[in-house]
Each structure stands twice: as C-alpha cells, then as structure tokens.
C-alpha cells in the first residue's frame, strides 16, 4: 500500500481540486518535485512523469507565448497516467488547454495560494518524512537530558524497569517494546511509538501502565531523534568489558551508524543512574570533552616523565 497519495497532499496543504477527482488516489513514490520549464519548450526526453509537477509564474508566463496547437500538445504530454498531480501556485488562472488535458487523462489538477518556492519546500519536507526508510527495533526509547537513548537487549533483561526508573527521575518516555524508526536524512534517525502502545509501559508482574496518566504529560513525548544506543546484557564473567571508554562501538540502523555502549547487568547495579551518566558523558564527548582520552594522555605523560627520570 502506498505511503502517500495525491489525496493526502490535498488534505495536508489545503489544495483546491480543480479537476481529475478520479485520480486523487494516485500513489506518490518519490519526494523529488518537478518544475516542467524545459518541457514547456517541447523537450520531453527526460520528463520525470512520476513526480509531483509544480507550475509557477515563470512556467505559465512562457506557456502564454505558445501557439494554441503547441499549448494543447505540451499539456497532453504533461498529463500522463503516471503523473500524481499538477499544482498551480499563486492562485494563478488555469489554462484551458491544461484543464482539458487533465479531464481527458483523469490526472488531478490542483491549485495553491502559496508561492512556488515556499510550497516546493513544504512539499519536499512532507514527502521526505512520509517516504523515509523505516524499520522497527525491539527496545525502549527515552529522552535523557535531550539525548535520544535507545535501550536494547534480550527480553527480560530489565529494559522497561530501567525506563520506568528514568521516567521517575524526570526523563521522558518515547516508546516501549517496539520502536518505529525512520531515516529522515543520511545521519538522522527519528524514533516513535506505534499508535497502539503509545505512552504505555509493560512491567513484568505489574502489567501495563500508562506513563502519561501516572506521571503527567511532561513524562512522555511523541518522537525523538536517536543519537545513542545502550545495549543491556546479562553479566558474562568470561567477557572483558570496556573499563576506560576509549573504544567506541557502532551499531548500524538502516544506513546510519550510531554510537553503542554495552552495559552488563547484574544485581546491585543502578542501571538508571549509569544510563543517565552515559547520556551526559556522550553530550560532553560531542562538545569535545573526552574524560577517557584525557586520562590516557595524562597516563602517557606520566609514563614518559618516569622514563626520563
């Protein structure tokens, strides 16, 4: 099922439907837009018919200079069965040739009061958000000091209980159990909760609780950019865990690599506090303050000084 149809654009941007009502369910598969200026001159060799077409003042002013026969020919070529819609900006008058071609092909012809540049920008942002690659990850997403922390780990390791403690400490829950992630940009992942389980948290032995009802609207948020992954795993005595923080793991989600920290879980460890500190330390590293690197440099300086003596 297509993620976006022409009907969605009409509703989202309050566009006026002039003709082609039968085609409002046409799918839109790309966020790229087209301003068919060179096509108006008759060059259709590389016409991107699958894109939303925008006709601004420049295109329609040039169109007025054409002969009647040329106008009919160009508009028939523009209105294909593949084209999602044509949008006329600035509330300009609709050429009769375009109206006729739209009716014959069943292609939606729309109109907006916005300028071409403004509408183009808004359409691109909307379509990129809707058509972005998506995936779902088993885990919990929490906003900690402005850092979107995705807590992962095998079932029963304590992810939801840790999230509950973080919420009690003033942080905000985004999603529990299933985190829907979309890649809005090359390095931007945004996580949210499925509508069915939004603001809900499952605690074994207690059941399902509504975080917003219990802790208020300030304890939840609808979406958050993910910048850090913390993986919880049962403590393995045979495994060597990072004790300095010099080595940085990475986790790839869709096409974006995120910093990953592995936290071993065992009785007596306050995971909520550790994750809080991990988020703050991550922010410090992004600001250029790396405590592990500073310690390493001091250690190397001390060793060199000792060797000189």
From Swiss-Prot:
Binding site for ATP: 153-160
Alphabetically ordered keywords of this record: ATP-binding, Carbohydrate metabolism, Kinase, Magnesium, Metal-binding, Multifunctional enzyme, Nucleotide-binding, Serine/threonine-protein kinase, Transferase
EC number: 2.7.11.-, 2.7.4.-
GO BP terms in the entry: regulation of carbohydrate metabolic process
Catalytic residues, chain numbering: 138, 159, 177, 243
GO molecular-function term, one example from the UniProt record: protein serine/threonine kinase activity
Cofactor(s) in the UniProt record: Mg(2+)
Reaction(s) catalysed by this chain's protein: [HPr protein]-L-serine + ATP = [HPr protein]-O-phospho-L-serine + ADP + H(+); [HPr protein]-O-phospho-L-serine + phosphate + H(+) = [HPr protein]-L-serine + diphosphate
UniProt: Mg(2+) binding residues: 160, 202
Remarks, miscellaneous: Both phosphorylation and phosphorolysis are carried out by the same active site and suggest a common mechanism for both reactions.
Family statement: Belongs to the HPrK/P family.
Entry-linked NCBIfam families: hpr-ser
Subunit structure: Homohexamer.
Function: Catalyzes the ATP- as well as the pyrophosphate-dependent phosphorylation of a specific serine residue in HPr, a phosphocarrier protein of the phosphoenolpyruvate-dependent sugar phosphotransferase system (PTS). HprK/P also catalyzes the pyrophosphate-producing, inorganic phosphate-dependent dephosphorylation (phosphorolysis) of seryl-phosphorylated HPr (P-Ser-HPr).
Name by which UniProt lists this protein: HPr kinase/phosphorylase
């Amino acid at each position: 099922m297509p993620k976006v149809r022409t009907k969605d654009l009409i509703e989202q941007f309050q566009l006026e439907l002039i003709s082609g009502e039968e085609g409002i369910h046409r799918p839109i598969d790309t966020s790229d837009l087209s301003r068919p200026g060179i096509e108006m001159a008759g060059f259709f060799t590389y016409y991107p018919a699958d894109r939303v077409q925008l006709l601004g003042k420049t295109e329609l002013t040039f169109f007025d200079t054409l002969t009647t026969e040329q106008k009919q020919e160009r508009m028939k070529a523009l209105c294909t069965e593949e084209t999602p819609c044509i949008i006329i900006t600035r509330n300009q008058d609709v050429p009769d040739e375009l109206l006729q071609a739209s009716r014959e092909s069943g292609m939606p012809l729309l109109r907006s009061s916005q300028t071409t540049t403004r509408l183009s920008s808004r359409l691109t942002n909307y379509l990129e958000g809707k058509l972005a690659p998506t995936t779902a990850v088993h885990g919990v997403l929490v906003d900690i000091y402005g850092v979107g922390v995705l807590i992962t780990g095998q079932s029963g390791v304590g992810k939801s209980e840790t999230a509950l403690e973080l919420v009690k400490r003033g942080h905000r829950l985004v999603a529990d159990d299933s985190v829907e992630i979309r890649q809005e940009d090359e390095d931007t992942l945004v996580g949210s909760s499925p509508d069915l389980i939004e603001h809900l948290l499952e605690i074994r032995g207690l059941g399902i609780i509504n975080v917003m009802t219990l802790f208020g609207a300030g304890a939840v948020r609808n979406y958050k950019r993910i910048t850090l992954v913390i993986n919880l795993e049962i403590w393995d005595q045979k495994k060597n865990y990072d004790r300095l923080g010099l080595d940085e793991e990475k986790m790839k989600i869709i096409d974006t690599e995120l910093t990953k920290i592995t936290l071993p879980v065992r009785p007596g460890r306050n995971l909520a506090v550790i994750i809080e500190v991990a988020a703050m330390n991550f922010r410090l590293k992004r600001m250029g303050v790396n405590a592990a690197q500073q310690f390493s440099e001091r250690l190397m300086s001390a060793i060199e000084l000792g060797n000189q003596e």
